[in-house]
Curated annotation (Swiss-Prot):
Chief location category: mitochondrion
SUPFAM superfamilies noted in UniProt: Dimeric alpha+beta barrel
Gene: nipsnap2
Name listed for the protein in its UniProt record: Protein NipSnap homolog 2
Gene3D superfamilies noted in UniProt: 3.30.70.100
Organism: Danio rerio
GO molecular function, one term: protein-macromolecule adaptor activity
Amino acid sequence: MATRVLHSSCSGLYRAAGPARGKGHATAVIRSLSASHNRPREDSWFKSLFVRKVDPRKDAHSHLLAKKEDNNLYKIQFHNVKPECLEAYNKLCEDVLTNIHTDKAYPCELVGTWNTWYGEQDQAVHLWRYRGGYPALTEVMSKLKNNKEFLEYRSERGKMLLSRRNQLLLEFSFWNEPVPRDGPNIYELRSYQLRPGTMIEWGNYWARAIGYRQHNREAVGGFFSQIGDLYMVHHLWAYKDLQSREDTRNAAWQHEGWDEVVYYTVPLIQHMESRIMIPLKNSPLK
């Protein structure tokens, strides 16, 4: 249809300019416009040769991206605290969460606990690890129902909170497992809401990219959601201070291949958020 329209339009030019000159001119116009019409498609096809493709899969991305040797499940909690209650809330968590963490009867560990410094204000973030996966989580939840100290904590906590939410996460196989580290450090939690169906592609690129971001031991952990907000990725980083963060992030651009990772992963993101967090006294990640 587009070619017929072009012929129709150009025939008018042909009649106006004369048979000899118009015919050649109309043909040139048709060829020029046809080439312009097809060029974006050709360019797109040409560029597609260099875009990393993800092979079709017949398995859940949780099986393809998570660590096979460990059966760890993570829970991240976001608690928005009444401003006037933040100090009391922190003290309450310092006592009770530490007791759960150190009690061998509970197959769980407190990976880290923080207050958000930049991002949502008056917010606490807790990251737990359950060694043994969902059965370990179920066991912990069952035992906590009979833990008097925890029940009192939960009652007091309810008076201090404005809202709360959580997610269950798995860790990417190409990230190191988060382990306690000495401080003082600040932590950045970068959260990405991906477009549905792009988690495998994200994992493919970041499996290569993580090598560019470990020179200052800044990489702490990488996770993707299983329950809660889906297609959500969390990357946790540690820095000495904000200037160290700036310098470390800028240095990544000096490594060949980092720019390509950014170029191809940005279109996979629907929304992203950065939190700068300060560890609490009882946090294993100092």
